[in-house]
Amino acid sequence: MLAKRIIPCLDVKEGRVVKGTQFLSLRDAGDPVELAAFYDKEGADELVFLDISASHEGRETMVDVVREVAATLAIPFTVGGGINTLADIRRILRAGADKVSINTAALLRPAFIREGADYFGSQCIVVAIDAKFDQALGTWRVYTHGGRKQTNWLATDWAKEAVRLGAGELLVTSMDQDGAKTGFDLPLLKAINEVATVPVIASGGAGAANDFVDVFKYNYADAALAASIFHYKETSIQEVKARLREEGECIR
């Protein structure tokens, strides 16, 4: 059995880590380099760095900050935001990242997933899916540009297509649960897990250690990502791992 992974997420805007609710109402959470070093020492299994306004603002990811963060880490590091070309992927990997997360660019041009996987390997390509429940459809719809633009893709269909094109991992964020701290969106994750044949990272909604227990108990995800509960010291990675050990989960 593969060990479940606990992944802190650094949402970065203008060089600072921020966190909001449902992608809005952002507040400062600290310096990305300092937080990265802290999480590495605390026992994080991986780290995700998302330049959350790069795609919306049409600019490149902050490579200098990525390089600084990578220099502090001994754990795998994924970077996303504003990655639109193979040259962007190469630049981020050379700056020290192990994987890239692509979202808007993949939806605008799905062939980009295959190009990235063919050139750098599927293990480097994480496709991020920002999904929000559509009451009229009774299912989840995918959004781009940091949750600002609705697409015609249903989350389950896009997950299947992303995997078919070469995604090595899916980072699934529930926009409904983002920052709400009421637990991961288990119905969404169940739906994605049923169609995905690659590892799924659960994101959006973690509010306590028991939320990690729930998402792993049903095997709806291979890893779980959280931001605000770690940034604001509401719980710690060690506390989450201790709780998972109590439940008999396989963790690092």
Swiss-Prot record:
GO terms for cellular component: cytoplasm. It is found in: Cytoplasm. One of its GO terms (biological process) is L-histidine biosynthetic process. The keyword rRNA-binding does not apply. Its EC number is 4.3.2.10. Its main location: cytoplasm. It catalyses: 5-[(5-phospho-1-deoxy-D-ribulos-1-ylimino)methylamino]-1-(5-phospho-beta-D-ribosyl)imidazole-4-carboxamide + L-glutamine = D-erythro-1-(imidazol-4-yl)glycerol 3-phosphate + 5-amino-1-(5-phospho-beta-D-ribosyl)imidazole-4-carboxamide + L-glutamate + H(+). GO terms for molecular function: imidazoleglycerol-phosphate synthase activity; lyase activity. The active site is at D11, D130. Pathway: Amino-acid biosynthesis; L-histidine biosynthesis; L-histidine from 5-phospho-alpha-D-ribose 1-diphosphate: step 5/9. Pfam families: His_biosynth (PF00977). It comes from the Bacteria. Keywords: Amino-acid biosynthesis, Cytoplasm, Histidine biosynthesis, Lyase. IGPS catalyzes the conversion of PRFAR and glutamine to IGP, AICAR and glutamate. The HisF subunit catalyzes the cyclization activity that produces IGP and AICAR from PRFAR using the ammonia provided by the HisH subunit. Heterodimer of HisH and HisF. Belongs to the HisA/HisF family. This is Imidazole glycerol phosphate synthase subunit HisF. It comes from Shouchella clausii (strain KSM-K16) (Alkalihalobacillus clausii).
